[in-house]
């Protein structure tokens, strides 16, 4: 759909479709976002997932977070039936990497910034020997046990904190990841990425585990934990709290976010980062999770950030990353696209076709 030539006060010039699960809609597409987007010439339209995608729209831009294989087939049909019409963000092939905790954090090793991933091992065999696995990976307790698949279900967020070996054995019934738990002062830094913008929010996290807890044989060997990182912490200088330098420097956060964005080939995601402070090693940062298309309503000022991003994508003013992320899912269309601009279902002007 070509943009209409109209003033900002007239009807929207662009149509952005969104295909999200119901629970995701409520955490992203709020009235405040709809109003701001409309005021700036963008109309947000929900995709009816019960109807063929190719029969809807047309859309200038399509954002999505759907998990079933049928959705990818619908994107391919949309490209075939309406070539050169819609830009899709982000590409299914790039998103796939974040739906498997075995590959989710691989990108971190390629970053140029001093950040890493806690040691972890993938358990794919229910008959695996716990001692052998732990020894081979050189893991130390406590551990976090995470389901291998990330599919939006409640089960994919069912995690446990494991204090000793006999807490591991009951968990080996399903594919999972065992990751070392790093004491981090009960503070998690959740970084929201929208295009080239990164916003860091301090949130509560699991408290540190004292050494004596690992030796307490009368205590439970493992315990489930809910996702308690959704509550923002007070500013670091409130009520005698942490020092002013508690939150990572903005330049550091931006550099990490930029590296992840280029390595993943994604525009919309967040990542969880923690910091270990010790006299032996000083400050060490770890990335423990990356999530595609998070609940942006928890990000301060998300309405303006998303609206700006939509317009940049639609107007072709997005900065060009160094490389396209792994696998577009629609390879023949992705070749028409500037690196990092999603799936190229829209033909780009020849002047913008080169990176």
UniProtKB/Swiss-Prot annotation:
Residues 107-318 form the ATP-grasp domain. ATP binds at residues 101, 146, 179-190, 205. Mg(2+) 1 binds at residues 272, 289. Residues 225-248 are annotated as: Disordered. It holds the Pfam family Ins134_P3_kin. Gene3D superfamilies: ATP-grasp fold, B domain. InterPro entries: Inositol_tetrakis-P_1-kinase, InsP(3)kin_ATP-grasp, ITPK1_N. It catalyses: 1D-myo-inositol 3,4,5,6-tetrakisphosphate + ATP = 1D-myo-inositol 1,3,4,5,6-pentakisphosphate + ADP + H(+); 1D-myo-inositol 1,3,4-trisphosphate + ATP = 1D-myo-inositol 1,3,4,5-tetrakisphosphate + ADP + H(+); 1D-myo-inositol 1,3,4-trisphosphate + ATP = 1D-myo-inositol 1,3,4,6-tetrakisphosphate + ADP + H(+). Highly expressed in embryos and at lower levels in roots, leaves, flowers and anthers. The keyword Ribonucleoprotein does not apply. This is Inositol-tetrakisphosphate 1-kinase 4.
């Amino acid at each position: 759909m070509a943009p209409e030539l109209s003033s900002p006060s007239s009807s929207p010039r662009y149509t952005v479709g969104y295909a999200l699960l119901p629970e995701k809609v409520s955490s992203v597409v709020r009235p405040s976002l709809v109003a701001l987007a409309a005021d700036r010439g963008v109309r947000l339209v929900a995709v009816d997932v019960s109807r063929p995608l190719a029969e809807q729209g047309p859309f200038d831009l399509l954002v999505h977070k759907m998990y079933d294989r049928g959705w990818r087939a619908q994107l391919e049909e949309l490209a075939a039936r309406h070539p050169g019409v819609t830009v899709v963000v982000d590409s299914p092939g790039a998103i796939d990497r974040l739906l498997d905790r075995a590959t989710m954090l691989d990108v971190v090793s390629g970053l140029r910034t001093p950040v890493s991933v806690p040691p972890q091992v993938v358990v794919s065999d229910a008959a695996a020997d716990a001692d052998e696995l732990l020894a081979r990976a050189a893991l130390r307790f406590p551990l976090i046990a995470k389901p291998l698949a990330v599919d939006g279900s409640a089960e994919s967020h069912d995690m446990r904190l494991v204090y000793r070996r006999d807490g591991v054995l009951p968990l080996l019934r399903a594919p999972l990841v065992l990751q070392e738990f790093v004491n981090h002062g009960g503070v998690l830094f959740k970084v929201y990425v929208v295009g080239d913008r990164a916003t860091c929010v301090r949130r509560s996290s699991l408290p540190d585990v004292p050494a004596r807890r690992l030796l307490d044989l009368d205590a439970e060997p493992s315990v489930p934990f809910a996702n308690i990182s959704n509550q923002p912490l007070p500013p670091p200088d409130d009520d005698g709290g942490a020092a002013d330098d508690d939150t990572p420097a903005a330049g550091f956060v931006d550099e990490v976010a930029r590296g992840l964005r280029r390595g993943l080939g994604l525009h919309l995601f967040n990542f969880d980062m923690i910091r270990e402070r010790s006299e032996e090693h000083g400050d060490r940062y770890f990335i423990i999770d990356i999530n595609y298309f998070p609940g942006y309503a928890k990000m301060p000022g998300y309405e303006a950030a998303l609206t700006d991003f939509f317009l940049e994508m639609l107007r072709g003013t997005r900065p060009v990353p160094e490389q396209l992320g792994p696998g577009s899912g629609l390879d023949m269309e992705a070749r028409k696209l500037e690196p990092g601009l999603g799936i190229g279902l829209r033909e780009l002007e020849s002047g913008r076709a080169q990176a």
